[in-house]
Every structure is written in C-alpha cells, then in structure tokens.
C-alpha cells in the first residue's frame, strides 16, 4: 500500500460487478461489437467471440484481478514492491507504464466519441438532424460531415461537456462517485437496451436480421478471423490498460475472484449480444446494409430511425444508451490515471483529477478533434491523429501490457498468485489456470500482437 490508511473496498459484490460491467461495456459492446459483427459474417463472429471469451477473456480478467487485489495499489506500483519475499525487478514497472500510456491513448479519442454522441442527441432533439420522416444515406452522411468532421469547435464543446460530467462524478471518490454512478446508470442502460431490443425485434422483416446475427456461416470462420476476434476481446473487456487492476485493488480479500471474472465476462457478452439484437433486426427490416463499418451507428442507424414510428424518440433513447455506456467506461479509465498520480505524488484527489482530465483534453482530445478538420493532413503511421491513438493503444500498448501482466503472474507472483485464488478455489483448477496463463496465454497474445502489426 502507498498509504498508511486502509484501502477502501466496494460496498458489496453487486456494486463491484456493476462497476466492472460499466467499465467493460462502453463503445466496445454498443458500437464496436455490432459493426464488427456486420463486417465479419454475422453469426460467425458472434460464435467466435463467445469462444474467445473462454480462451483469453476470463483467464486474463483473473490475471489482472489477481495482480490488483494482491498488491492493493495503483496500476504502476502493482508491478513493483516485493513478491515471495524478494524485491520485484524495476524493469517490470515498464508493464505498468505501458498500461498508463494505453489508458491515455484510448481516452484521447474515446471522449471525442462521447462528444459525437452528445452532438447527435442535441441535434436530433433540436431538429438539425430531422429524422421524423425517411431520409437517405446522403442526408446522414452530409450531417456527419458538417456537424462532426467540419465542426471542430462544436465537438470540442460537447467533448468538454462530457469531461465535466466525468469530473463531477470522479470528485466524489471511487465508492461515493464511480460505484454510486454505476449503481444507477447500469440498470438504466439495461432498461434502455431492453426497450430498444423489444422495439426492433418486433419490426416487420426483423427475423432476417436475427438469422444473420445468430446463424453462423461456418465458411466465413478462418484462423485469421479467430485471431482478430481474440484481439477484440481485450478491447471489449478493458484489458491491458490497468482498469481491472485498479478496480480489483479495492476488492475485499474474501471475494471469489473466479466467480467475479466469470460474471464479468458473461455480463459483457450479454450486453454485446443484446446490442446486436437492438441493431441488426432494424437494419434488415428497412433494407440498410449491415456491413457499413464504423459509420454503422452514426450514419446507417439514423436512416433506420427515420423509417420507424416515433423514430426520433427511439433515436434519442439509443444515443442516450451509448452515452451512458461511454460514461461508465470513461470513469474507470480516468480512475486508472487518477489513482496512480494521487498515490505516487500524495497530492489531493481533486488536483489529480484536474491534471488527468485537463491533460488528456488538451493533449489528446483536441488533437483528435482537429484531425478531422484543420489537422486532417497530419498522419502518424499513415493514419490521422484520432485513428493513430486507437491503433497505438489498441494494437500495441494493450497487447504488450497484457503480455507483461501474464508473464508477471506466471514468473514473478507465482505462489502469491495461486494464493489469491486458492482461498475460494479448487487446487486442481487453480493449477491448470496458472499453467495456462504462464505458458499458453503469452503465446496467444504474441500471436494477436504480430497479427495486428502485419
């Protein structure tokens, strides 16, 4: 511990699960998962995603939970101190540093997506995006170009507004702020999600979309696709940038880590699958292509809503759902950096929050916003700044942090890692998990890493 004060713990298992679920759903489940399903064979992708949760998802949740609870400190110091009575080599701190940089990278563009969503909500309510009657793809594309790509100051304002909402919750602390927010926001998210699913699966022609979504076309399943899906699980579960390590550092020592890991994976998968039920039946009902990629939510779905009874109302509900998912995730990613700065420097929490939020807004959010306008000609690795943040954090830093975490558990923590699970676990099961994490998981992560780069 970095403080003489005992560390807070979550009020109960339910609030921890809700907080972790909020950390993992975000845009990964509500935006990224559906468009990747549409691009990669529908049911085939869903089938592989469920397999990937078992192969890499649950084992890696346990890796980060074991590190976090055992060390009980921030995501940087978790890779330091002593283990098994011996000092941990300082080189392991590099794993923590990569995770922190990954957290910065994802927040650099993630908050901007939140700004986009707020823009859609306000413009739909205000009538600037009029979907009260059927519109074409040209209309939604024109709106995206005018109000998202070519309106940097408008998006900067909405992004700043989203940052302020995060700040208002974060100043209340981990338990009083993040936990309490998850306690109310996650049930609201489920309510909105169920309402949208019920509405869309009852549309005429919805069954065609459900079939596309649930019936795997095994001819589309390839080794390359499976490796790709394995990589997406890291994004879906917020693995590799310190979120699970930070959140589990507040876990009670009596909590069953295996059960919480399984529940976390099931909850994330359930929300992602429900998001698909919310989207694909409506796409097929109104003849909109499901494989429109990242623009699916922002350009294709408004066409669907414009053809739907009470479309603007359901559109506002949908984008509000996205905003809630983004908020519950952004709070926990911010917390990774806030906890680290607060514990390393001993400054007040309010000061740490200001440093993190202002720093990311100035050096991450603003460049990401400008990359669609005045800075569109600036490229990093052949990508604009917005996409470069995504690529570097998602394909490089997350993978290397996850690899380092697995190796840290297997070769540094060793018996201490097993002890965290043996209290509530079976010896045989724990030994199998440990061997799997020590030898096989690093190979899987290396395979994903190389595949992402080449």
Where are these regions (language model features)?
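Inter-helical loop and helix-membrane interface segments of multi-pass membrane transporters/permeases
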Residues: 4-7, 36-40, 70-98, 111-171, ...
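Membrane-interface "cap" regions at the ends of multi-pass membrane proteins
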Residues: 1-31, 60-65, 69-97, 252-256, ...
